[in-house]
Amino acid sequence: VSYSFNSDLANGSESRSGNGSISELYLGGAWSPVKGLSVGANFSYMFGTLEHSTAIVGTSTSVFYRMMEVRDWNVHIGAQYAIDINRKNRVVLGATYTPKKTFRGNTIGTFYDAANDTKIDTAFQCNMKGNYEQPNTYGVGISYNHGTKLFAEVDFTYQDWANAKYTPMTGFEPVKVKFDNRWKVSGGLQFIPDDRGNYLKRINYRLGAFYNHDYLNVLGNNVRDYGVTCGFGFPALGSKSLVNLGFEWKHRVSSPTCL
């Protein structure tokens, strides 16, 4: 989570920001029942903290702060099927699914009124189980290989956040907190001129792009971001390792109002 928005009010302004992440430790396995087909699953333990704050500045200043501590398990399942067109050309189709589930952990809300020099007070606290949910997540992708020279891939991910349960904090948020369904499409390719040629021809050249419709809905505005990436994989002298260098340009916008 990483965002920051500002909007004008009749007698002041409102700013919202958030940061944090949820990490996962994985244990996975896979099985190939028939040639070309692979199925597998990852079981993981999730842990991390998400922080959100809202500051209202006017004749007085009030700060609302929410922290969510997640400690939970998760499961991801997937399958892929490889089609060998000939000796050099291969197409791989893949799909993934992460089921909807309730989060386990705790959430705490605090409030501070600068005008009255109010002490920071815990105004809301609850167990996340049964109050906050992770949505269903679906993913599909297709990739193409031409020997070791060319690799290209396109992926699509969809999460139905609009149907995920989210219990608002009393006094902190509207009775109904709205999320948008999230979807993202991304693609990339890697090109190696000649993996047996001179040094410049053995460099990995990479290019990609993405478009993301986020689940955030801020004051009725949809949030989305898009960007391009490029990178290089430089062969390390005397070994088969690569030294990777990458760049990314990203732009985040909201509509219909620019925040």
Predicted regions and their residues:
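Outer-membrane beta-barrel porins/channels
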Residues: 1-259
